[in-house]
A protein has these predicted regions:
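RNA-binding accessory domains that recognize and position tRNA/RNA substrates
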Residues: 1-73, 77, 81-82, 96
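Short, glycine/acidic-enriched loop or turn micro-motifs at the edges of active sites
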Residues: 52, 93, 178
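Active-site environment of divalent metal-dependent phosphoester hydrolases
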Residues: 54, 165-167
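Short loop/helix-cap segments at secondary-structure boundaries that form the rim of catalytic
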Residues: 79, 126, 168-171
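Conserved small/polar residues in nucleotide/adenosyl-binding loops
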Residues: 172-178
Length: 181
């Protein structure tokens, strides 16, 4: 660490941040392997837990999915052996570019199982597909962000808390595999 008043060059500071403790493991909200029983008429969805919110589990359960919490340290091989319908990569804190282990795992999952991501999970999935994620100059933080949904003639006010985004320039000529559940 460093103290106020101590001089530190930019490269040293970036290195310090990139090698900081694993905040994802500290923020996993679900118990790995826990099973929230839904109707199971649809199947099981794995939640790769980078700091998931309980509301995500609740929505999936209301859609009659069982949900299985997966540790961010789990191997792709073990995840694929769980016989899941798909994987949700959850939201969570931090710079997605520093999560190389999770990105490598997701790269091995792509093409083998349907995957979708929320916030940090979307950024991880984008990095695994070769896209670029950039730090926003001014992050989106707070509960007053209007979002227009196509087909609805009004804006919804949303709560947001993110400081990174997928760089639109990085996917202008990329074809991604798609599948449905």
């Amino acid at each position: 660490m460093f103290a106020i008043g101590q001089e530190i060059d930019k490269d040293s500071l970036v290195n310090l941040v990139m090698n900081a403790r694993d905040i994802i493991g500290d923020n996993s909200a679900l118990t790995a392997g826990s099973l929230n029983l839904g109707d199971d008429t649809v199947g099981k969805v794995g939640i790769l837990d980078l700091g998931a919110k309980q509301s995500i589990v609740n929505v999936l359960n209301k859609l009659n999915f069982q949900t299985v919490a997966i540790s961010p340290k789990e191997s792709a091989e073990n995840i694929l052996s769980m016989n899941l319908k798909g994987i949700l990569i959850s939201n969570g804190p931090g710079d997605p570019r520093s999560l190389e282990g999770v990105i490598n795992t997701v790269q091995k999952l792509i093409g083998n199982i349907p995957i979708f991501g929320i916030c940090l999970g979307h950024q991880i999935l984008s990095l695994a597909c070769g896209l670029t994620v950039k730090k926003l100059e001014f992050g989106h933080h707070g509960s007053n962000h209007p979002v227009e949904i196509k087909g609805i003639k009004k804006a919804l006010i949303t709560a947001q808390n993110h400081g990174f985004a997928v760089d639109a320039v990085s996917y202008t000529h990329l074809t991604l595999p798609t599948s449905s559940w």
